[in-house]
């Protein structure tokens, strides 16, 4: 039941109080240290840029294995491959956080390679089989090259880009074919294949097939 109340205590000028409320007892000797650790992890919201940084951090997640992901959205979306590559530059490079870009891309690269090698996925990156995902991956890497430099990008992701292009060129993707005109084609009649992925009765509402742009 809702039970309003208040707490009173005497403090000296300049003294700080750390208050903790929970259903179980806390070790009070460690509360101040815990509070400071939480403060240090948070972004200050004292200007517009810091507010954007704080908002971006809400989509940065890391699991117990140390794999880094971008959450597709709240309240129920999981890390999705397409959403990851589309949003990754804006949620990392734009706020000068190259390390998280590289961490999330490391996780994504593992998933991409497992998909291309037809191995079971060991990362929690969903919908990686969609035909535009490898193209968005290359686009995200291009954004990294613009910010971090071509040489560094080539060193870190050159082989991945080459392997993705080879995968597509050799017609190994289950729903992305390289045509004689040099464009890539996909079939979206049975399932949604792009970001316009709303469905009704298990079928795409907007069946996007052909040379999707």
Spell out what each predicted region is.
Residues 75-108:
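Alpha-helical support elements that line or immediately flank enzyme active sites
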Residues 1-78, 151-152, 162-173:
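Acidic/polar, glycine-enriched structural segments that form the non-catalytic walls/loops
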Residues 88-91, 141, 161:
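Hydrophobic core/packing positions within alpha-helical solenoid repeats
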Residues 41-60, 96-108, 180-191:
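An acidic intrinsically disordered interaction segment
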Residues 54-68, 105-117, 190-203:
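Active-site-adjacent bridging/hinge elements
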Residues 1-6, 10-18, 115-136, 142-159, ...:
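The feature captures the catalytic groove of carbohydrate-active enzymes
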Residues 83-86, 133-137:
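Catalytic-loop motifs flanking and including active-site residues across diverse enzymes
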